[in-house]
Amino acid sequence: MVTPRLQTMAESSKFKKKVHFGETRSDRTKKLFRHYTVGSYDSFDASSDCIIEEKTVVLQKKDNEGFGFVLRGAKADTPIEEFNPTPAFPALQYLESVDEDGVAWQAGLRTGDFLTEVNNENVVKVGHRQVVNMIRHGGNHLVLKVVTVTRNLDPDDTARKKAPPPPKRAPTTALSLRSKSMTSELEELAVDIASVRRRKDVQVSDVECLKRRIVIRVALNKSEESGPISKPLRPLDNTPVNSRVATVKQRPTSRCFPAASDTNSMYDRQGIAVIPPTTPGSHQGPFLGIPRGTMRRQKSIDSRIPLSGITEEERQFLAPPMLKFTRSLSMPDASEDIPPPPATLPPSPPPPSPSSFNSPKSPAPRGYGTIKPAFTQNSGTKSPSPAVRSDNVGTIARDKSMYFRHEANRFSLDSEELYNSNMSTQQNFINKRSKMPENPYSEVGRLGNKGVYVPAKPVRRKGMLVKQSNVEDSPEKTCSIPIPTIIIKEPSTSSSGKSSQGSSMETDLQISEQVGQLRPDESLNVSGPFAAAIAGAVRDREKRLEARRNSPAFLSTDLGDECVGPKPSPRLQHSKSIDDGMFCSEEKAKHFMAPSSLIINRGSSNAFTNNDSSHQGDVSNARMSKIKGPENNAAPAKSTNASGNYMHPVTGKLLDPNSPLALALAARDRALKEQNQPSPSPTDPEKADLNKPLFIDTKLRSGMETINANRPNMRGMLKRQETESKHEPDSSKEEKRQGEKKNMLINIMDTSQQKTAGLLMVHTVDTTKADNVLTESEEAEKDPPPENSNSPVSEPREELENSIPKASECGTPAAPHIKAIVSVCSVEEPVILPFRIPPPPFASVDVDEDFVFTEPLPPPLEFANSFDIPEDASQIPPASLADLLIQRKNRAFPPPSFNPNIASNSIESKRLAALSNCLPTSFMQHPESFDNVTDSGIEEVDSRSGSDHHLETTSTISTVSSISTLSSEGGENLDTCTVYADGQAFLVDKPPVPPKPKVKPIINKSNALYKDAVLEENLDNFAVPLPAPPPLPLSIQPSMTKAGQQRTSKLWGDNTEVKSLVMPSPKANVISELNSILQQMNREKATKTGEGLDSPTGMKTASLSTRGTDALSTVSGNRNAAVTFTIRPGANQPISLQNRTPEFDSRVTGMRRAPSPVVVSPAEIIRDIKPGPLSAPPASMSDVFILPSQPPSGDMFGMSMGRSRSPSPSILQQPISNKPFSAKPIHMWTKQDVAEWLESLHLGEHREMFMDNEIDGTHLPNLQKEDLIDLGVTRVGHRMNIERALKQLLDR
C-alpha cells in the first residue's frame, strides 16, 4: 500500500510542478470546489475507491525530539459534529508529513494517515488544536490510531494521474489565510472529496491533496515541538502529497524538514513565497548539513505564514516553540529570554538561545527581523545568509538565525576557528557595539555562509550575552599591574580595579601592560562585547586608580600602586601572591621588603618571609636565599625556586617540584627575578612597600592554589593561597610560623590600588618596621592561608596569637601591630573568617546579621588580611608580652622607621615592634609617631575615602584589629587592620610610607593601651566610651575608634584567656587604669549617652567609628589604633570583626546579641549613652576610646566619614548625636527626629522624602526594602546603612 501511495505522491508532485505553477491559488480553488457540494460529498461512496487500513501505533519519543510527523487538519475549538467521516476522509486530522526515520515513521505512520484516536480518545471530529493539545499532554508517549486510506488504482488511474491534480487547498484553508471558518473550509473540503470520489479517476494523490485541503493546515505546536524527527529534506518528487498541502513541519527539535517538494508545492499552492523555514529539522539536531538554500525552502509554516500576511509577531506565536532543538530546543521558549550568545562563539552546545539567531523556529523563526529588525539587518549584512531571499528583515533574520544557530551548533560558539575567522568581524561588531542589537552571532551568520543551518531561536530583545572572556584571558583586562595570581575580588572594580583585574591576569600579560594601561580593546578583541564591557570597567578602574593615586591617600597608601601602575612589568605586586617575594618584583619591593617586611627567619614560617627576604636581597634570588635558616624552610619553597625544591611555607616540608605550590613558587620566583630586574626600585621603598602589600584574593584563595599549581608561571599566584595550601599541607611549618608569627606583625597597607573588594593588601610588619614588614608579609601569607585553610590556618593563627599575646603582654599598645593579624583571622575559626567580612561588593553589610558574637568568626578571607593569629597567642605567657613590651618600650620607635635589617629577621625584633605597637602609651613615644601616623593615617584615610582608591568599597571598610581580638590577650592589639568590604585590609601600623608606620605603631600603642583597658573592662565598660585617656593623642583616639570598627577575630576568645592579662606591670597597670577609666566612661556613658562619641565627630560617636571614619582612620595611622575590644575575662568568644566599619559596628550592635564580646559596637555605645544594656556587645574600643573630649578625633572621623565614598557602616554606626532623637526611643521619634537621624547617617539626601512621607519613629522599624525604595533610597548601600542603623537603634 505504501508503495502505490508513494508513487502516487511522487507522480502527483511531479504533476503539480507541471500543472500548477501557472495557476493562481484562486484558480485552483475554483477548480477544486466548482463541481461539488457537501451533499454530493456525503452521498458519494468511495468504498470501492479506497482501501482503508486501520492501525494503532505507540510512539515513544525522547524529550529532545518530536514524534516525527506534522499533523494537519480542520481547526475548530470544539468537535465538528457536522463532519461525517467517509472512507476517503475518515477523520479531520491527518498526517501532513512524516519524517523519514522519525519516531512516527518507524512506527509505520505515513503521510496522509488520518488520525482517529489519540491516546485512546476519538478525535475523528476534533479540531486541530485540541488534538495537538491531546498529543502534547501525552508527553513523550503517544498512542495513535490511524486510518490509512489507499485508493484502489483503476486502469485509468495512470491516465488520471497525469490529469491535473485537484487544486491545492484553497487559500481559505491555507493556514496563513485563516479567513474562512472551519465549517466553510470543511464544506469545501467535503466538496472536494465528494468530487474526488465521484470521479474515481481522481488519484490517491488527489484524494490526499483534497484531504490536505480539507484540513486546515495548523502547525502542531507542541507536537511539532515534540519534534517530529528532523530528516533531510525529501526530494520534491518523494512527497507529492505533501507538496500539495502546506506542510507544517515540526519546527521542534527534530524539525522535520518538509520535503522540499512539500514546502515548495505547498508554498506554491498557497501562493506564498517560499521562505525557507529558519529551522530545518534533522533528527540529528540543529546541525543539518543542509545548504542554506535548502533550509530556506524548508522554512517552517510560520515563515510561510508571515508571507501570507501574518505578522512576524503572530508567526512567532504560531510557530511551535523551538524547544525541541537538540541545542536550544531543550530550553523552552525561555530561549527567547536568554541573552544572545557572546560575540565569541559559545561552546559547541549552543546556549538555549545563543542569540536572536537562535530564535526558535517559531512560526516566524523570529530573526532579529522579528524582534530586532535592526539587528537582523546587521546580521543579514554580516552574514550573506540566504535571508536575503526573505524580503523582510524578519525573514532575513530568520534565515540568519538558521545559519547562525546552525553554525553555533556546528561550530561551537567557543570554536576558535569560527571565532578567529570572524574575529575581525566580531571586532567590528564589537566596535559597533552601539549596534549591539546585532546578534553577536552575526559573525556566526558569516559562518552561516558555510551553509550551516542554525535553527532560528526566538530573538531576544535583551542585549546579547557576550561570552565573558576570562579576566585572566585578557592582559589588558588584567590590572595593568601584573598579578600573576588571580586575585580578582568580587568587586574587581575595587579601588585598584586594575589590581583586581591584574590579579586575575597572568603576570606576563600584565607585563606588557602598565598599571594604567588596561586595554579594553584587546580584551574586546578577545571577548567581544563582553570584552568591551570589561574594557569599560577597566577604564573606569584606571580612572579610579588615577584619581586614587592623585589623591593624598594614594600617595600615602597607594604609592605601591603608583609604582606598580607606572611599571610596565607584568608583575602587580599588590596582586602578587601575598608573598612579598611575589612582589619580589622590584627593588621597590625589595625596599619595601627590607623596610616593611622583616627578613626574619620567620621566612620559613611564611612564604612571604621567604619571598620578602629574597626581595630584600635579590628580590627573586635573595628572596630564596636570604631567608634565614628557619625561614629558609619557607624560603626554600621560594628560594628553592631556583633549585626547584621548595619548602612548604606553612609546614616547612619540601614540596614536590611538581606540586602546584612548588610550581607556583617557582613561577613566582621566576617572576620575581624578572620583576626585580625591570623594577628594582620603581619608587621609594615606601612605594615598594605599597606594592609589597599582597593582594590576597580571599575568595579565590581556595581556587588559587589550584590555579597556582596550574600556572606555575604565574607569579601572580596568591601567596596567600600558596601559604594557605602550605598551611593546609603541613602543620609543622605552620608551627614554626606560629612561633614566628608571634613576633610578626602583619600590617595590611591601605592601598588605594586595593580598591578591588576582593583584594587584601597584606603588609607584614615585624616588630622592627622594616624587618617587620617582611615578616608580616610572610605572616600575612601564612595567616591568609590559614584563613583559607581552616586547619592549617588555625595553627598559624595560634602562632600568631601566641605572638599577639606576647605583644599584649608587652603592652596593650603592642597589640596594634599584631592587631592586623588578629583582626584578619580568628585563631580558632579560620573558616568563619572568610565570611565574616561582607564581600567587597556589599559595602554595607549588616554586621549584626553577619556576626553573631556568640561565636566570633574570622572575617572572610577576602577581607581578612590573611593574618592568622594563632589561638596560641593567648597561650603566650604574659611575661613574654611584658618582655616584648619592655623591649618595645626601650626601642618603641625603631619599628616605625623601616630598617630592612633591623632585627627584622629576629623574632625578638618583631616582638619588639609588636610590643612598641602594643606598648602602653606611657611606654611609647606615641605622641610623636602618633602625630605622624595620624597625619599620614588620616591622609590615607582621607585620600582613600575621597578617592576611594582602595575602597571603591570603602564604605565597607572595617578596621579589623587583632587588638580587639587579642584585647584580653594582653592588649596585644595587632595593628588595626582596616578591612574593607572590598576585602582589603589596611593596617595603619604599616603605612605604605615609613612615616606612617612610625606614627601608626605609636597609634597602635596608644590604642593598645586603651584596648588593654578595654580588655580589663567588661562589656558594660565598653558600652560607655572611656573618658578620653590623656595618654591617647586625639589622632590616636580616632584610630581607636577605628579599632572599634575592627572586626574581632576569634582571637577574642583567646583574648578572654589573656584577659587575665598576666601582663608586665606596665601593661597591667595600664590595663587596670584603662579598665577603671572604661568603667568610669561606661558610667559616664550611661549618664551622657551621646556625649563621648558625639563630641569627636558630632556625627557618630567615635566609638561608633563610622565605617567611613573608621575606615579612613583605619587607613590612616588611626587604623593602627584600631580599638582593641576587650573580651570580658569570662567571655571566650572572640568578637569577630567589630572593627569592620560602621557596617561592622552596626554588626557589632548585632554583636551585642552575643554579650560575650566585650567590645561594644558603636550602636551599642549609643545605647550605652542612652543608658542601654551594657550587656550588649561592647562598643568597639574606638567607641570607648573616643572620648567626648576628643573633638580632634571626631574631626578626623568626620573627615574620614566625609571622605568615605558612601554612607558606610561607619555612617550607619549611629553616631551618638546631640540631637534629640539620640535620647529618645526610636518609637518616640518624630519626623524631624527621623530626618535628623538620616542626617547623622549621612543620608540626608533622603531626608526630604522621609519627611514628605511623614516617616516617624513608629514607621522606621517596619520599613522594608520596598518601602525604602519607594522613599527614594534606591542605593543598596544606603538601604543597608539605614537597616543597619535601625538594627542598632532597635538593639539599644
From Swiss-Prot:
| Basic and acidic residues compositional bias, start-end | 719-743, 941-952
What intrachain disulfides are recorded?
Answer: none
- State one molecular function term (GO): SH3 domain binding
Major place of localization? cytoplasm
Cellular component aspect of the GO annotation: cytoplasm; dendritic spine; postsynaptic density; postsynaptic membrane
Family annotation (Pfam families): PDZ_6, SAM_1
Alphabetically list the UniProt keywords. Cytoplasm, SH3-binding, Synapse
Q: What sequence ranges are listed for the domain PDZ?
A: 56-150
Disordered, as annotated region: 155-176, 331-393, 488-508, 604-656, 671-743, 774-811, 938-968, 1087-1115
Q: Where in the cell is it found?
A: Cytoplasm; Synapse; Postsynaptic density
Stretches assigned to the SAM domain: 1229-1292
Entries under SUPFAM superfamilies matching the protein? PDZ domain-like (SSF50156), SAM/Pointed domain (SSF47769)
Compositional bias of type Polar residues: which residue ranges? 375-384, 604-623, 1098-1115
Q: Which InterPro entries match?
A: PDZ, PDZ_6, PDZ_sf, SAM, SAM/pointed_sf, SHANK
Q: Does the keyword Cell membrane apply?
A: no
Skewed-composition ranges (Pro residues): 338-354
Q: Record's SMART domains?
A: PDZ, SAM
Instruction: Locate the compositionally biased regions of type Low complexity.
Output: 355-365, 492-504, 953-968
Location of motif SH3-binding in this chain is 991-997
Q: Cytoplasm as a keyword?
A: yes
What family does this chain come from, according to its entry?
Belongs to the SHANK family.
Q: What does this protein do?
A: Seems to be an adapter protein in the postsynaptic density (PSD) of excitatory synapses that interconnects receptors of the postsynaptic membrane including NMDA-type and metabotropic glutamate receptors, and the actin-based cytoskeleton. May play a role in the structural and functional organization of the dendritic spine and synaptic junction.
* Identification of the protein by name: SH3 and multiple ankyrin repeat domains protein 2
Its gene is shank2
